[in-house]
Amino acid sequence: MQRLEGGEFLMGNEGDYGFPADGEGPVHAVVLTPFYLDATCVTNEQFNAFVNATGYKTEAERFGWSFVFVGHLSPSAARERARSRVVGSEWWCRIDGATWRHPEGPGSNIKKRWGHPVVQVSWSDAMAYAAWAGKRLPTEAEWEFAARGGLVQKRFPWGDDLEPEGRHRMNVWQGVFPNVNTEADGHYGPAPVKSYRANGYGLYNMTGNVWEWCWDWFDPGWYRTSPRDDPTGPDRGERRVMRGGSYLCHASYCNRYRTDARSSNTPDSATTNLGFRCVRDV
């Protein structure tokens, strides 16, 4: 874990590149106390240790199905895609048997992906792991402070240039979403957790690769009333915050692979592009 000293920073953005409906602004000052944050997302290997120690069953395992990106379906799951596509988001399919052990559905596995971020985990699953590990999920403010890596009001953990010196610095969709991915950044799906260079705080893949669960309930109007010191989000809600974007993000569809971008999902949801990392209090 990396120790972050906290302090005051400017959270949010008011630029024309964001999504007003997500409530990315207004920019406001936040003050955080010090905390420790995992340098990487929780890996398949780490989650496997948790499951072996506790016998925990994820929500996807209990439900018997989960969501898989259409381009990643295992051969057996691909046969079901016509009847399982999500209306309005046809690149997602509801697949029976898709779990953290079989992320793309029956026939897929994680045997060569122990160092990849665990996916197909819900907010509740992430909370269970964090409690077992003696940690917790980061607040949205802690996450953004960490992602910025000490930079002030920059779009990415390294600055404002998406590809500085022509080099890819994160795992996002390259090509024409959702049908053509050139893999110019070296990856088609999730990348190992220490891919690309760490940010100024020694944290890896804070943007791109997989979305990351945060503690907070999601409210697009929250920044207008959020307290200055150690905010923890609204008291109630229907969806939990997720941050960072994923390998499925593209400028034409989901320009949320930024330090200030916000999104959300229901706490029982699990997908092939959603993971988490943990915080420990100082």
List each model region and its residues.
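Non-catalytic, well-ordered alpha-helical segments in soluble enzyme domains
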Residues: 53-54
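Short, structured beta-strand segments at or near domain termini in extracellular proteins/domains
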Residues: 272-282
